[in-house]
Amino acid sequence: MTVIYPSPIFGPVHSRRLGVSLGINLLPEDGKVCTFDCIYCECGFNSDHRPKKPLPTREEVRAALEARLQDMQKNGPVPDVLTFAGKGEPTAHPHFPEIIEDTLALRDKYFPKAKVSVLSNSTFIHRPAVFEALNKVDNNILKLDTADEAYIRELDRPAGHYSVREIIGGMKAFKGNCIIQTMFLKGGFGDKDMDNTSDKYVLPWLEAVKEISPRQVMIYTIDRETPDHDLQKATHEELDRIAALVREVGMAVSVSY
């Protein structure tokens, strides 16, 4: 069963990585809009969830967010974070930069201690307006599942033009103002072995992470049902080993098992 995210506001939910998180979904609630089609995505495969409804407008997002924040200010709970996530890639919304401006202003008005986080697959960070918007949020969380482009094409299945070297270059441009998020898993997809926990994938990934020099690395594994049922969680030991390698090069790392 795939996860359903209402639009434009959902939750709050308890996030393994972020705490009490109020979700902001800039995609239609009846489908999925993403430049990736990850085989582990809790929202299912893109082809199974084509939306019929339009994207929420900037005005709809702002009004819904303010109403929810007013309710939370009165009735609780206090959010730790306002998180752009949901059913697809938030930076694909044509008014993403303006929505970030609105969100930061509303955060400052109602819950100034809350963080604003964006979970992004990094495919639009080459756009100047998107880059500038991501540079303003508290937690600019960018996906990099490996540094191996052939593997990314099997795991994340990006649409259109995709170059992992260009993505890494775009991440470097944040000059440390980013968090790298990486999914580690095992199992197969069709006849392909999708295990990325071995040194074959981990060591080149670690070199890329060193090159990007983020302020933090988040490593995690499958938590919910995936559209491909042959995938498996990475073990605690495997994640701990990878985390130790990250710490050895002097970077902060968090692990979600």
Q: How would you name each of these model-derived features?
A:
Residues R17-A63:
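Canonical Radical SAM [4Fe-4S] cluster-binding loop centered on the CxxxCxxC motif
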Residues T83-E89, N121:
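Glycine-rich beta-strand-to-loop/alpha-helix junction loops that act as flexible
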Residues A92-Q232:
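Conserved AdoMet/S-adenosylmethionine-binding subsite of the radical SAM
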Residues S21-G23, V81, I141, I179:
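Short hydrophobic-acidic sequence motifs that mark active-site Asp/Glu residues
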Residues F45-V81, H95-E98:
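Conserved alpha-helical substructure of the radical SAM core
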